[in-house]
Amino acid sequence: MENTGFYVIPNKTQYEIGERVWLEIKKTGPTKANHVKVSLFTYQGENLKMECTLEQGVYIPLAESISEKTGGYLVKIEFFQKTEKLGSCYTAFDVVNCWTEAPRYGFLSSFSEEDKQKEEYQEFFREMHLNVIQFYDWMYRHDEFYPESDIYTDIMGRKGSMTAVAKKIEGVHACGAKAIAYGAVYGAESFQEEHPECSYRYDNGEPMIFIDKIWLMDIHRLSLIHISEPTR
C-alpha cells in the first residue's frame, strides 16, 4: 500500500552536526489523512518513532539528538485517518561533520536573467540529496571569468547574468548544499593569441582546438600560463 496524496523530503540535502532536521510533507492530491507516524531507521534497526497531526503544519521537526552524531537514516512516513492507515512514503537523510565525508554530485548549467528568480532546483536537490553542486559554464570566458556588465554572452552564444549566478549560489546554500565553480584551466581563447607557444599541439604542429573555439593549453608551463585569481 503506497500513499498517493503526499510525499516527504528533508528540508536540506544534508545536515552537519548540530543542525536541526526537519521533514517537509508535500501534498500531491486529495487525501483524507489527518495525522502521521514517523519512523527512523539505521542499519542497526529502528531508531525513533513519533506521531503528529497534519494540522501542525507541513514541516515536522525531529528530535535534536538525531543530529548530535554522524549517520544515515531511512525515514518512513505512514498516513492515517483516525486509526485507518491510508498509505506510506519514504525518504532519507544523513548527518556529517563535513560534506566531503559523503559527497553527492549535481550541477546547474543555465544562468540566464530569467533564471535568477527560479528556485525549483532547490526542491529537486533536496529530493535527490545532492549536496555539492557544480556551476557548469557559468563564466563569461574560460580565460576571463567575469564580464564587464551583468548581462553577457558566453562563448556558446548563450545569454547569461552574473546576478543569476549569485542568486543560484544563495539558493544552493539555502538548501544545505555547497556550490563549486567549474573552471577549465586548460582552455583559453584570447590568451592563446598572446602565448601561442603554450598551446598543446599535434605531432604535425597544429594546435589542439575544442569545438573550434577553445585552445587547449599546456598548464605545466606555469611560468607562462596566467591563472586568474578566482581560480586559485
Spans of model-derived segments:
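Short edge beta-strand/loop segments characteristic of extracellular beta-sandwich folds
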Residues: 20-28
